[in-house]
Structure formats: C-alpha cells, structure tokens
A protein has these predicted regions:
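Terminal-region recognition feature
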Residues: 1-138
C-alpha cells in the first residue's frame, strides 16, 4: 500500500511514489489517495506508472480532487469511502484554469499554449476513460 496523502502532488511526491512502486514485488499495487491534486506532470507520471501494473487499486477514503482524480481513474479498480469525492480534472497554468487562459484575447501566446495543453489533456483523459467507459459514451 502506497499512500499519497498530500495537499499538493508535486514532483517530489511523484518521485517517492515511483520509488515505492519500483520496490514492489509482483504486479499489484494499491494507492491510498487523499489530495487536492497538484502538478499535472507529477500526476501523469504516477498515472502512467499505475497503468504498468496488472492489478491496481485506488482507495479514496475522503477526496481525490483534480490530479488525484486523474490518478484514481488510471487504476484498474477504484474503492471509495461512503462520503468520498472525486472532481473534474481541471489543469491550471500560472494559477489560472487552462480553459479560461485559452480564451484570452490579451495574450495570444499564452492562449495558444493553453489551447495546446488543453487538447493534450483531453486526449490523455479520453485514453484513460476508454478503459472504463464504452466508446459510444465518450
């Protein structure tokens, strides 16, 4: 069992989780998530590593918000507490939601970067959801 109990998942948290995964014997892993999310890169690294296990379980006793939701959805099984919560995966750049930055008229380069980022994240999420949701519902 690998706990991810952190208000913010950053690269150092991801490094610790990946190191713990490397130490596991076998092809099973269980993550316990209690987080508000964090750095998209860190969450994607953990998600990609989670996909490498034949059997993976994400346990969410209370909350796995944004990037925590992304990680939880990449497990082959999700177990949630009675009052647990997931949320939208809502990436941010410079403290602003990507979807809002993509609409900026004042800074075209930031808006273009945000649109590119948003398209990439939507593709990643679509691939993640394909494992759990029939194609027709995506």
């Amino acid at each position: 069992v690998i706990p991810i109990v952190a208000p913010f998942i950053d690269i150092s948290v991801a490094d610790g989780v990946l190191a713990a995964m490397d130490q596991l014997r076998g092809d099973r892993v269980t993550l316990v998530l209690h987080t508000l999310g964090g750095c998209v890169t860190a969450c994607v690294l953990i998600s990609n590593a989670l996909r490498q296990f034949r059997e993976s379980v994400a346990v969410v006793p209370y909350m796995a918000i944004s990037g925590g939701t992304l990680i939880a959805l990449n497990a082959s099984r999700l177990e949630m507490g009675r009052y647990a919560a997931l949320s939208a995966v809502d990436p941010m750049i410079m403290g602003q939601r990507v979807r809002h930055l993509a609409e900026l008229d004042s800074d075209k380069s930031v808006a273009a970067l945000a649109r590119e980022y948003e398209v990439a994240m939507q593709g990643y999420l679509r691939d993640t959801l394909r494992a759990h949701v029939p194609e027709a519902r995506l």
